Amino acid sequence: MAETLQLNSTFLHPNFFILTGFPGLGSAQTWLTLVFGPIYLLALLGNGALPAVVWIDSTLHQPMFLLLAILAATDLGLATSIAPGLLAVLWLGPRSVPYAVCLVQMFFVHALTAMESGVLLAMACDRAAAIGRPLHYPVLVTKACVGYAALALALKAVAIVVPFPLLVAKFEHFQAKTIGHTYCAHMAVVELVVGNTQATNLYGLALSLAISGMDILGITGSYGLIAHAVLQLPTREAHAKAFGTCSSHICVILAFYIPGLFSYLTHRFGHHTVPKPVHILLSNIYLLLPPALNPLIYGARTKQIRDRLLETFTFRKSPL
C-alpha cells in the first residue's frame, strides 16, 4: 500500500523509472518472448554477418555494399538498444531503469531511427546515380563519398535528437516513476511530467515530420529519376534488370516506413481509441522487425551477398 502511494506521488528528478511492459497483460506477456526473442536473434545474426562479409570480401568494397554494411550496423544498434530490456521485462516482469540510463536509451533509439532513415535515402540516391548515370557512377559515388555521407548522417542524427533528452531533463517534477512501456520512449516519459510539455511535444512532432517527410521526399524523388531512366532503356530485359537492382531496397523501405506509419498514426490519432498494448506492440514491431527482415531481404535478393554467405557458412571456395 505504501509503495502504491509512493508511486502515485510527485517526484523531483527520480533516481529511476520502472518499466512495466504491456499494461493489462500481466504474466501473459511472458509468451511474447517467443515472438521477440527469435526476432532479436535473427537481427543479431543477420546484421552481424552482413558487415563481416562485406569487410572480409574485397570484391564487395563498393558503395552499394558499403551502404548495406552501414545499414546493418545501424539496425544492429537499434535492435540492441531496446531488445535486451524488452525481453527482460517480458520474462522477469517490471524492472527499474536509472534515470540517466533512460535518457541515454531515449537518445539512442531516436538517433538510430533517424540514422536508418537517412541511410535509406543515401541508398536511394546511390541507385539513382547507378541507373541514371551509369557511365559517371564510379566518379560520382566513391568509397570516400560513402564515408563522408555516413559521417554526415550520424552527425545530423545526433544534432537533431540531442534536444529530446535535454528537454526531458529540464523538467523537475514527475507524477510517477512507472512507465507503461517496454523501453524509455520519449512520449511515454513525457506523459509522466508535471508541467507544460507543449514545447517538447511540438518538437517531437516537428522532428518526426521533418526526418521522415524529408527523407521520404528524397527517396520518392530518387525513384522518380530511376523510373525516368528505366523508361529510356530499349528492352524489357533491361527494364527487368534495372528494377531488380532496386527491388531489395524497395522492400527494405516498405519494411521500415509502413510499420512506422501505423505506429505514428495510432499514437497521434488513436490515442483514446486504440488500446495501449497495441500502441506498444506497434512501437516494438517498428523498431525490431526491419532489423530482422533487412538481412534476409538483401541476403536472398542480392546475388553477391547471397553467394558470399553461402561460401562462408558452407566452407566452399569461390571460383577463381
UniProtKB/Swiss-Prot annotation:
PANTHER family: OLFACTORY RECEPTOR 52W1, OLFACTORY RECEPTOR 56B1-RELATED. One of its GO terms (molecular function) is G protein-coupled receptor activity. InterPro entries: GPCR_Rhodpsn_7TM, Olfact_rcpt, OR51/52/56-like. Keywords: Cell membrane, G-protein coupled receptor, Glycoprotein, Membrane, Olfaction, Receptor, Sensory transduction, Transducer, Transmembrane, Transmembrane helix. Pfam families: 7tm_4 (PF13853). Residues 52-59, 126-144, 223-242, 301-320 are cytoplasmic. Glycans are attached at residue 8. Its main location: membrane. It is a multi-pass membrane protein. One of its GO terms (cellular component) is plasma membrane. It comes from Homo sapiens (Human). Odorant receptor. Residues 1-30, 81-104, 166-201, 264-279 are extracellular. The chain crosses the membrane at residues 31-51, 60-80, 105-125, 145-165, 202-222, 243-263, 280-300. The gene is OR52W1. This is Olfactory receptor 52W1. Gene3D superfamilies: Rhodopsin 7-helix transmembrane proteins. It is found in: Cell membrane. Belongs to the G-protein coupled receptor 1 family.
